[in-house]
């Protein structure tokens, strides 16, 4: 049994609508272990650093405005196949076509305000986790 870790973010729209507990409960119900968690309010520099791979895309400025508009909750999730399983559970970016039962189907407002983020690969998960957490803040079981 090989456990993986992935980064999850509960985005500003979900935080502002008091969905943190609901999302965490659903994660635990799906077998994800939360091994690190914190709430923070990103400044522009932090948001741009995190989303640097999107800096040349048309939606970048809107994404940065959104991600700095209110607090977020960042979590490190652990389970077998964590990256793939969490991405499946999140649903597609566009909530209008997200599958029933996914987080984005249930909670997203639109493609930008889509409630949650998840790492798209193991390599990116490692980079994203390190962006927000020191090793001493992660309590792997």
From Swiss-Prot:
Q: What is its subcellular localisation?
A: Cytoplasm
Q: Where is the active site?
A: 117
- At the top of the EC hierarchy, this enzyme's class is transferase
Pfam families in the cross-refs: NDK (PF00334)
User: Which PROSITE patterns does this one have?
Assistant: NDPK, NDPK_LIKE
What's one GO MF term for it? metal ion binding
The GO annotation for biological process reads: CTP biosynthetic process; GTP biosynthetic process; UTP biosynthetic process
The keyword Nucleotide-binding appears for this protein: yes
Q: Which domain of life is it from?
A: Bacteria
Tell me what this protein is called: Nucleoside diphosphate kinase
Its source organism is Histophilus somni (strain 129Pt)
